[in-house]
Amino acid sequence: MGSVRTNRYSIVSSEEDGMKLATMAVANGFGNGKSKVHTRQQCRSRFVKKDGHCNVQFINVGEKGQRYLADIFTTCVDIRWRWMLVIFCLAFVLSWLFFGCVFWLIALLHGDLDASKESKACVSEVNSFTAAFLFSIETQTTIGYGFRCVTDECPIAVFMVVFQSIVGCIIDAFIIGAVMAKMAKPKKRNETLVFSHNAVIAMRDGKLCLMWRVGNLRKSHLVEAHVRAQLLKSRITSEGEYIPLDQIDINVGFDSGIDRIFLVSPITIVHEIDEDSPLYDLSKQDIDNADFEIVVILEGMVEATAMTTQCRSSYLANEILWGHRYEPVLFEEKHYYKVDYSRFHKTYEVPNTPLCSARDLAEKKYILSNANSFCYENEVALTSKEEDDSENGVPESTSTDTPPDIDLHNQASVPLEPRPLRRESEI
């Protein structure tokens, strides 16, 4: 049995295979760009889906039913509404049936079911099981028709009335609490929190940066909003142990505090690819051939309920666009700011983006182009300003001096004149 278990979980089937894996494994587990270790299928199964649900199934869980029943309140809050209603209906009906049987037994033992008996009954007008069941419903729901009532003939009957009233209050409190907790769950708040379809890698302040965009579709704020990210990939340790999902934190400004965001308009989250980044040694070619997943998480408190919500998404390696930037979505109008969500997922290619890794860029192995080249965001802002000026009757010749033959998706060496531009909200 021990040998079978060893073969089942061992990644190395023989000493020769172990030597091959040891020679192919490198730091960070990505490979050297020329050859890549494939210990699993080429196409990675997404660990976190785009909608935030985790693609995980639990099997062979011992005593699962007992564990779920031990935490029955959380179980009722997590299950679907239809099952929740079924459980609550059963709770009421079973409690009515149980106490109806108790009152029927009391009447039976006391002889109240005998119509010829003239002595005082424990519960008046309870001479059948149906009558006992109706009395149980009237007692627990406090309907009080006044036709059936308990007498002082049997102390046990009085005790059962008191006990059923307490049980009914407990059931009502449990149901109301579970329903309110389920209705107040901030899970649906995630429907109005969105991530961009693709992440991008581009230059930002002279450094390669991984970026993705988040947005809030509601006007209500997300209090204490902050972001974090993790890179998931498989790797083999120096001892030959295979780790299917090694989790590596991606720094998005936790130390400096810029991971906390004011999410009123869409914001671009920036991860600077430095020597501490797991992407430091990866070039564009390595990214194209890599097999990893970046899980991004947005957390905050719902303003209406003060309950914490968490919105998740993920990006596979083939969903990271190298040398792209996001189109601007925030524009300054005369008395307000306008957010155009039709541009939220759109990107454009930035020419002259280094194709090398951040390490090669830091070691001056790649010569950067002119940093003052014309940017597409500026062209979009100027174009939008021209449209506003033309609507306000401003002559076209005074709006901008930008040459008309500039391509919106290409950079040109045209200096910008100082003028108030529309700005995108980014960190």
From Swiss-Prot:
Region (Polyphosphoinositide (PIP2)-binding): 181-208
GO molecular function: identical protein binding; inward rectifier potassium channel activity; phosphatidylinositol-4,5-bisphosphate binding; voltage-gated potassium channel activity involved in cardiac muscle cell action potential repolarization
Keyword terms of this UniProt record: Cell membrane, Ion channel, Ion transport, Membrane, Potassium, Potassium transport, S-nitrosylation, Transmembrane, Transmembrane helix, Transport, Voltage-gated channel
Annotated region described as Disordered, given as residue ranges: 384-427
Ranges facing Cytoplasmic side: 1-81, 179-427
Localization per Swiss-Prot or TrEMBL: Cell membrane; Cell membrane, Sarcolemma, T-tubule
S-nitrosocysteine, modified sites: 76
Residue stretches spanning the membrane: 82-106, 157-178
Major location category of this protein: membrane
InterPro entries per the UniProt record, alphabetical: Ig_E-set, IRK_C, K_chnl_inward-rec_Kir, K_chnl_inward-rec_Kir2.1, K_chnl_inward-rec_Kir_cyto, K_chnl_inward-rec_Kir_N, Kir_TM
Function as written in the Swiss-Prot or TrEMBL entry: Inward rectifier potassium channels are characterized by a greater tendency to allow potassium to flow into the cell rather than out of it. Their voltage dependence is regulated by the concentration of extracellular potassium; as external potassium is raised, the voltage range of the channel opening shifts to more positive voltages. The inward rectification is mainly due to the blockage of outward current by internal magnesium. Blocked by external barium or cesium. Probably participates in establishing action potential waveform and excitability of neuronal and muscle tissues.
Subunit: Homotetramer. Homomultimeric and heteromultimeric association with KCNJ4/Kir2.3. Can form heteromeric channels with Kir2.6/KCNJ18. Associates, via its PDZ-recognition domain, with a complex containing LIN7A, LIN7B, LIN7C, DLG1, CASK and APBA1.
Protein known as: Inward rectifier potassium channel 2
